[in-house]
Design a protein with these regions (language model features):
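Short aromatic-glycine-(Arg/Gly/Cys) micro-motifs in beta-strand/loop hairpins
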Residues: 1-9
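Well-ordered beta-strand positions in beta-sheet-rich domains
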Residues: 11-13
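Short, mixed-charge low-complexity intrinsically disordered segments
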Residues: 30-87
């Protein structure tokens, strides 16, 4: 599994989806995001979301969300290794 926050982090590869989501959530929590965004990402990528996220990756090839730092959006992506995420 690969996770990245475009413009902030390089793609990081993990053997297991739970590890990837945990690392992504830690990276998001380190950013100066508003409380609403942090709560959204906590819910979206929490440990209980592994099955749901995995299903979406199988169905759609990736999962995307947006993180806003000020007025600047950054795409947050989770996708399978070997699958180049669409830009």
């Amino acid at each position: 599994m690969v996770v990245e926050i475009k413009g902030i982090t390089e793609p990081a590869q993990f053997a297991k989806l739970p590890d990837a989501l945990s690392a992504l959530l830690a990276s998001l929590r380190a950013l100066p995001l508003g409380i609403e965004q942090l709560e959204y990402f906590d819910e979206l990528f929490d440990p209980g979301s592994v099955q749901r996220i995995g299903h979406r990756i199988v169905a759609y090839g990736e999962v995307r969300a947006l993180a806003f730092l000020g007025l600047t959006p950054h795409v947050v992506k989770v996708y399978t290794a070997g699958h180049e995420a669409p830009r």
